[in-house]
Amino acid sequence: MVEEATTQDQEHNIKLVFIGDTAVGKTSVIMTWTQERFPVGYEPTVFDTYYGTKNYAGKEVKLQIWDTAGHDDLGRLRPIAFVNTDCFLICFSLIDRNSLKRACSKWVAEVKATAKNCPIVLVGTKLDLREEREERARETSSKVEQDKLL
């Protein structure tokens, strides 16, 4: 059974949920950020949870990071991860032009339907593999403004 957190605990605990298409790099971003290592090879995720601690503004912030499956077959399970989320990070691949479109049409809609007032951050992945940087940057900025994302 989950215990209720005190107000003080809630101020220092943040739940982040990463969502996006299969193979856009959600797990790679999470592992690089929390474990300071880049994963070798690709293994599809169903659900996974990572924990980390970061120092922000002189305070220790405990992170609970949910890595969700991008595969459509698991779409009914995904909202389980959405409960009590503080921020959604919607990932898209910078090397796949359609990935940004799906992020904004599919994933933003899914989050807004389930967690209406939760912040959404759009995360472009695979920057190291990207070409046509300026054009993609303009497209991304336009989508961020249009959908009121961070």
Q: Residues of each region from the PLM?
A:
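Post-Walker A helix-loop "phosphate-sensing" segment adjacent to the P-loop in P-loop NTPases
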Residues: 35-43
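ATP-binding glycine-rich phosphate-binding loop
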Residues: 46
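Ras-like small GTPase catalytic G-domain
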Residues: 3-19, 28-36, 49-150
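The conserved Walker
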Residues: 22
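Conserved glycine(s) of the Walker
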Residues: 25
